[in-house]
Amino acid sequence: MTTSSRTCPVPAVNGHMTHYPAAPYPLLFPPVIGGLSLPSLHGLQSHPPTSGCSTPSPASVETQSTSSEELVPSPPSPLPPPRVYKPCFVCQDKSSGYHYGVSACEGCKGFFRRSIQKNMVYTCHRDKNCVINKVTRNRCQYCRLQKCFEVGMSKESVRNDRNKKKKEPTKQESTENYEMTAELDDLTEKIRKAHQETFPSLCQLGKYTTNSSADHRVRLDLGLWDKFSELATKCIIKIVEFAKRLPGFTSLTIADQITLLKAACLDILILRICTRYTPEQDTMTFSDGLTLNRTQMHNAGFGPLTDLVFTFANQLLPLEMDDTETGLLSAICLICGDRQDLEEPMKVDKLQEPLLEALKIYIRKRRPNKPHMFPKILMKITDLRSISAKGAERVITLKMEIPGSMPPLIQEMLENSEGHEPLTPTSNGNTAEHSPSISPSSVDNSSVSQSPMVQ
């Protein structure tokens, strides 16, 4: 016997007791369960209650409503907005959080940590007051570290962080197990010095500009061309000096040294000028401080090569290469056994192997959380070769645009790069190959040492 205010109790479902009206089909269940039945969601939605219970009271209706709502998952609450940090206090790049006491980007955080943990001692080649921002931060390590201290980064935080990590059990193999051997470390240091002493960084230069044809493109601005060709000649001499300082380079035959220099000279020229790119002004700066915008670079002689070079410069920016990486990549471009007409390609390959290993280890130690950075940087050699091939063609077309003769060093070093024979008329009207007028020993009065520099 039931009353009008009583509902039919049901067994627990998934561990919960609840109340529902009687099932619409009570005769389908054995009488031994006392008229109780499991609720049918389908029945609840499409049939009114029938025999077994009277109309439920308002209190039981409230209970039913609550129980039904429990079976329907509530929509997820919206995620809180991502936390926005102030820009990096050191370089003004996008911050990834508070590191060692200040808001900092991943690059400056890692730089400060490595500098403190390894007790690095840096030197500034200017007045110890270099501008540090996200473009120039890799150009002077001394001033970057000083700025880290100035904005409040704490040495003690680095030491505490290191001790904490030592106590934590390692869940996976560390990515910082790459260690330089003494030989590779010495090789890396020699190449870094060779690069820095033959190519001053942007922060060491006193920039100056010119208004010559700055607003519109012309076929060739002869004033800019004269200045550019003068600077290009000096740059080539510096590249030869850089090559002579590479361990093992002067142990190669003179013919192979000349072959490698001619094949890679334009690669290194482009790589070097692109590291002096300033994206905010879209300009490039030469070694005497002359700063040209994109239009002026076109008019100075780059012509159709201009946009390719500026695109490559933009692609280098996210790699954040420092002087050591640029020097090693330049050395790998130069000492390459797949160049045409080498007398001893196997010996050249053997010299390149430690350069590749040094670059790989240096990149992995500098960027332990970016294991794919080494192949990314190495693949830039392919881009450089593609631009250089077009650059060699541009040198040939320039000969028809300039009123005088091509500066001999530019013609000898660039026009005779791989796949492009120099065009010098002979007495019978045919073209003949230049005899090499430039060699590593003829750039200055010193002779080429034939003793290997590697141990």
Swiss-Prot record:
The keyword Transport does not apply. GO terms for biological process: cellular response to corticotropin-releasing hormone stimulus; retinoic acid receptor signaling pathway. Residues 183-417 form the NR LBD domain. Residues 154-182 are annotated as: Hinge. The lineage of its organism: Eukaryota, Metazoa, Chordata, Craniata, Vertebrata. Coiled coil: none annotated. GO terms for molecular function: nuclear glucocorticoid receptor binding; nuclear receptor activity; RNA polymerase II cis-regulatory region sequence-specific DNA binding; zinc ion binding. Residues 435-455 have a biased composition (Low complexity). It is found in: Nucleus. Both isoforms expressed in heart, lung, kidney, liver, brain, lung and testis. Isoform Beta-1 is highly expressed in testes and brain. Levels increase during testes maturation. Isoform beta-2 is predominant in heart, kidney and lung. Composed of three domains: a modulating N-terminal domain, a DNA-binding domain and a C-terminal ligand-binding domain. Residues 1-87 are annotated as: Modulating. Residues 88-153 bind DNA. It holds the Pfam family zf-C4. The keyword Transcription applies. This is Retinoic acid receptor beta. Keywords: DNA-binding, Metal-binding, Nucleus, Receptor, Transcription, Transcription regulation, Zinc, Zinc-finger. It comes from the Eukaryota. Residues 45-78, 416-455 are annotated as: Disordered. Its main location: nucleus. Receptor for retinoic acid. Retinoic acid receptors bind as heterodimers to their target response elements in response to their ligands, all-trans or 9-cis retinoic acid, and regulate gene expression in various biological processes. The RAR/RXR heterodimers bind to the retinoic acid response elements (RARE) composed of tandem 5'-AGGTCA-3' sites known as DR1-DR5. May be required for Sertoli cell differentiation and spermatogenesis. Belongs to the nuclear hormone receptor family. NR1 subfamily.
